[in-house]
Amino acid sequence: MTISTLGNQQDDSLVSNAFGFLRFPLNFQPYSSDAEWVITGVPFDMATSGRAGSRHGPAAIRQVSTNLAWESRRWPWDFKLHNCLKVVDCGDVVFNFGDAQDMSDKLQAHAEKVLASGKRMLSFGGDHFITLPLLRAHAKHFGKMALVHFDAHADTYPNGSQFDHGTMFYHAPNEGLIDPHHSVQIGIRTEHGRDNGFTVLDADQVNDRSVDDLLAQIKETVGDMPVYLTFDIDCLDPAFAPGTGTPVIGGLTTDRALKLLRGLQPLNIVGMDVVEVAPAYDQSEITALAGATIALEMLYLQASKKR
């Protein structure tokens, strides 16, 4: 038996085809697979207000993930992800390019089908608007959820078009998808409303307070509700993630973001996404690498609960 250095996966092939995130198997019928988590790319950026290009984010995250796949286990975890969690990558959602409504409908339908088959989802954007149809699907399955939201922007603005990557978390509470009083926004450092019920841990707090103190507040706020976890890559300082459409200085380091993510392990996380990676503005793939690493940490969180 030949063992590839990429993810300790058996590989006797003489030819190579496109591969999934972290070289997980591609499965275009994930609903009938034995997977526990399904990775879905959403190459959509029509709701962007700044620089476009995040539609190429899913491909960039997958491509750079081969730099992570050679490790049999990700530091500092003490187990192999592949041994604890069944994951497939089902590729990208297919929709009519240029039709935001069609994307929203197709993504929600796909998510509802995945969840109905007993699986859970990790999605790659694409701009942050994709989280809204995902929340609609998850709320149908899990009921009203708490939101744990890493971002430079609160995305609670009431203005904007029907499809806008700055209004999802205005619409989501109004549609009854999430409970803002049990939701936390982390790393915010732009103008935002203060009377909408969300707990906002702005960038100054996140950078100045201890990780343990922050995690205690997050856990107390969320309680035992089902949690949707969304990570906009512009939560990170542009020094660590320049490749995004709306960068804002003064953000989180990758070290602090990873420590906060690892501390979310006790939460009942039912869905996750990583959004707003725009490789056209990246340098040496560091933004894509940050996105891929954050996605991998999210999967390790889920795998750790099975040990």
Swiss-Prot record:
<feature type="binding site">
    <location>
        <position position="151"/>
    </location>
    <ligand>
        <name>Mn(2+)</name>
    </ligand>
</feature>
<keyword id="KW-0464">Manganese</keyword>
<comment type="pathway">
    <text>Amine and polyamine biosynthesis; putrescine biosynthesis via agmatine pathway; putrescine from agmatine: step 1/1.</text>
</comment>
<dbReference type="GO" id="GO:0008295">
    <property type="term" value="P:spermidine biosynthetic process"/>
</dbReference>
<feature type="binding site">
    <location>
        <position position="232"/>
    </location>
    <ligand>
        <name>Mn(2+)</name>
    </ligand>
</feature>
<dbReference type="InterPro" id="IPR006035">
    <property type="entry name" value="Ureohydrolase"/>
</dbReference>
<feature type="binding site">
    <location>
        <position position="234"/>
    </location>
    <ligand>
        <name>Mn(2+)</name>
    </ligand>
</feature>
<dbReference type="InterPro" id="IPR023694">
    <property type="entry name" value="Agmatinase"/>
</dbReference>
<keyword id="KW-0479">Metal-binding</keyword>
<keyword id="KW-0620">Polyamine biosynthesis</keyword>
<keyword id="KW-0745">Spermidine biosynthesis</keyword>
<feature type="binding site">
    <location>
        <position position="155"/>
    </location>
    <ligand>
        <name>Mn(2+)</name>
    </ligand>
</feature>
<keyword id="KW-0378">Hydrolase</keyword>
<dbReference type="InterPro" id="IPR020855">
    <property type="entry name" value="Ureohydrolase_Mn_BS"/>
</dbReference>
<keyword id="KW-0661">Putrescine biosynthesis</keyword>
<dbReference type="GO" id="GO:0008783">
    <property type="term" value="F:agmatinase activity"/>
</dbReference>
<dbReference type="Pfam" id="PF00491">
    <property type="entry name" value="Arginase"/>
</dbReference>
<feature type="binding site">
    <location>
        <position position="153"/>
    </location>
    <ligand>
        <name>Mn(2+)</name>
    </ligand>
</feature>
<dbReference type="GO" id="GO:0030145">
    <property type="term" value="F:manganese ion binding"/>
</dbReference>
<dbReference type="GO" id="GO:0033389">
    <property type="term" value="P:putrescine biosynthetic process from arginine, via agmatine"/>
</dbReference>
<dbReference type="InterPro" id="IPR005925">
    <property type="entry name" value="Agmatinase-rel"/>
</dbReference>
<protein>
    <recommendedName>
        <fullName>Agmatinase</fullName>
        <ecNumber>3.5.3.11</ecNumber>
    </recommendedName>
</protein>
<comment type="similarity">
    <text>Belongs to the arginase family. Agmatinase subfamily.</text>
</comment>
<feature type="binding site">
    <location>
        <position position="128"/>
    </location>
    <ligand>
        <name>Mn(2+)</name>
    </ligand>
</feature>
<dbReference type="InterPro" id="IPR023696">
    <property type="entry name" value="Ureohydrolase_dom_sf"/>
</dbReference>
<comment type="function">
    <text>Catalyzes the formation of putrescine from agmatine.</text>
</comment>
